[in-house]
Amino acid sequence: MISQSTLFLFILLIIGLIAKNQSLIVAICVLFVLKWTFLGDKILPYLQTKGINLGVTVITIAVLVPIATGEIGFKQLGEATKSYYAWIALASGIAVALLAKGGLQLLTNDPHITTALVFGTIIAVALFNGVAVGPLIGAGIAYAVMNIIQMFK
């Protein structure tokens, strides 16, 4: 008999294939390999507890590569400060990081909310070709909205 988790992942794989979402397809295939081998017992719990931090680290490395390769240096930083688009990007980066901080708090304090956030991310990735940074940012947005609602109670 196929387990509920295997069936759920298989349905998501089909959605990923229909939507031609490579990230979702690869993620599910990796999870299947881990789940069906001896590696799953060790790696899946680690990924569940540390996966978001690991993902953020990988994204941070990717963002810093142009600095490491010398494509971006102090000259480009100075030139960027002359553009109002750069200032908008700077403010956006700060806002997103602060939202993510609140999201991390929410996911830590209310783990049951994770299910809704993960499902929302899956829908966005599979159907709208979104990027799976959603759970943390989504949790941050949810955290901010929840705090605003609390202010009016």
Curated annotation (Swiss-Prot):
GO terms for cellular component: plasma membrane. The chain crosses the membrane at residues 8-28, 54-74, 87-107, 117-137. It is found in: Cell membrane. It is a multi-pass membrane protein. Keywords: Cell membrane, Membrane, Transmembrane, Transmembrane helix. It holds the Pfam family DUF441. Belongs to the UPF0756 family. This is UPF0756 membrane protein Bcer98_3279. It comes from Bacillus cytotoxicus (strain DSM 22905 / CIP 110041 / 391-98 / NVH 391-98).
